[in-house]
């Protein structure tokens, strides 16, 4: 008989903790609904709690569809590594042949410099720079008009805030607009969030000769059996979507960010490699399990062990960590691989050193723990209000680890 991987009593406690977040007043941080999955060495538990839409009270289901936003990034990184394995891309080669719009960059002297106050880039952008978010351009935690470069980037609608698929132009136009701007930092100098993944998606499409949605479907989603994951939801599945909610700071009320049948119900002009996908918890579990199995899915190899090990190992130098992440102290206990965060110091009753994963700001989080064989997935329909994980995500992570049997 196989030993239990989780304590049944402690799993019941974990469910009660999650239910408390669902039953809490939504005007005071409560979650309308969620789906949670924990897995360890073949033992899988899934819970669906609350509703996926407040107005209809439609219940959350195991196959409810969520906008996974930045949990798209690990998938895009894995797709790029497929092309690296095929030697169509090399990690340290310049991206200029594929993305000539980004060649010959100028770099701001300081983040707050006028757009004309620049110096030449010291080297081209590499594939590795895109995978590690060190291309020299990205999101900054500041008001949209805090610096000239932020104002210019927002005016060009290149995706400097929460995902808005309907607002972004087609890939060629997106890259042209990005190429008009000076960089915020020298290539390879520091970690800057998000834009690298969007540029990586364009690189994958141009290198493979296929639109990004087609490449992901043929090379990742179909082999992994991920039937629910795409950049838009087909008409027959729209009823399974959750409504996406956010906290309206002006009114103090919970408001609709994207309704069922909203922006993700039709193919976008720009398939965002950084934040564009819709998925279900079962689909993302298949992707997470493939990584935990060192690139294998059933009898098929999707990625090499070497690719997965590189993707899930810390790529940042101490100097780059000292320059900071989205918020001060982000890299005190974590690093960054290829599209994933790596735990470098355990600071909570949750994922230990060597664990990896990432969050989606529209309300999702994922972690793989190779040492314990644990996969933890939480999908909610409420936006995070900060890059810091909200209480429901922190409590979920703690609940998973308090429930493990030795």
Residues of each region from the PLM?
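Short, conserved catalytic-motif segment at the N-terminal edge
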Residues: 8-68, 88-90, 106-116, 401
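Generic C-terminus detector
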Residues: 382-406
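Short, well-ordered beta-strand elements
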Residues: 366-368, 373-382
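Acidic helix-start/capping segments at beta-turn-to-alpha-helix junctions
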Residues: 96-104
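Hydrophobic (often cysteine-bearing) scaffold residues that line and stabilize catalytic clefts
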Residues: 10, 14, 18, 68, ...
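Short loop/turn microsegments at loop-to-beta-strand junctions
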Residues: 32-34, 362-365
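Short, surface-exposed loop or secondary-structure junction motifs
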Residues: 46, 106-353
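Active-site SXXK
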Residues: 18-22, 41-42, 67-95, 197-205, ...
């Amino acid at each position: 008989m196989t030993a239990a991987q989780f304590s049944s009593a402690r799993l019941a406690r974990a469910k009660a903790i999650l239910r408390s977040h669902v039953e809490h007043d939504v005007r005071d941080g409560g979650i309308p609904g969620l789906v949670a999955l924990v897995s360890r060495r073949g033992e899988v538990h899934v819970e669906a709690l609350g509703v996926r839409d407040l107005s209809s009270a439609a219940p959350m289901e195991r196959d409810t569809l969520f906008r996974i936003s930045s949990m798209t990034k690990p998938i895009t990184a894995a797709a790029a590594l497929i092309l690296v394995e095929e030697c169509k891309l090399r990690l340290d080669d310049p991206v200029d042949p594929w993305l000539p719009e980004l060649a010959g960059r100028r770099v701001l002297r300081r983040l707050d410099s006028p757009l004309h106050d620049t110096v030449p880039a010291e080297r081209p952008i590499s594939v590795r720079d895109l995978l590690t978010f060190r291309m020299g351009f990205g999101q900054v935690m500041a008001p949209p008009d805090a610096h000239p470069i932020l104002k210019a980037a927002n005016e060009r609608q290149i995706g400097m805030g929460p995902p808005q698929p309907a607002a972004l132009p087609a890939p060629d136009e997106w890259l042209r607009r990005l190429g008009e701007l000076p960089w915020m930092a020298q290539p390879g100098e520091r970690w800057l969030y998000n834009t690298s993944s969007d540029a990586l998606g364009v690189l994958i499409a141009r290198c493979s000769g296929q639109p990004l949605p087609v490449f992901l479907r043929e090379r990742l989603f179909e082999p992994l059996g991920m039937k629910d994951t795409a950049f838009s939801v087909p008409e027959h599945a729209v009823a399974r979507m959750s409504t996406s909610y956010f906290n309206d700071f002006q009114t103090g009320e919970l408001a609709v960010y994207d309704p069922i049948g909203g922006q993700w119900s039709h193919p976008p002009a720009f398939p965002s490699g950084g934040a564009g996908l819709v998925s279900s918890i079962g689909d993302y579990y298949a992707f997470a399990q493939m990584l935990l199995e060192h690139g294998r899915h059933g009898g098929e190899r999707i990625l090499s062990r070497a690719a997965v090990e590189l993707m899930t190992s810390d790529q940042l130098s101490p100097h780059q960590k000292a320059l900071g992440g989205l918020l001060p102290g982000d890299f005190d206990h974590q690093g960054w691989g290829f599209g994933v965060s790596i735990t470098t110091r355990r600071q909570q009753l949750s994922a230990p050193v060597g664990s990896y994963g990432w969050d989606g700001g529209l309300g999702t989080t994922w972690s793989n723990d190779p040492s314990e064989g644990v996969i933890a997935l939480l999908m909610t329909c409420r936006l995070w209000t900060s890059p810091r994980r909200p209480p429901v995500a922190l409590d979920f992570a703690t609940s998973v680890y308090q429930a493990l049997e030795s």
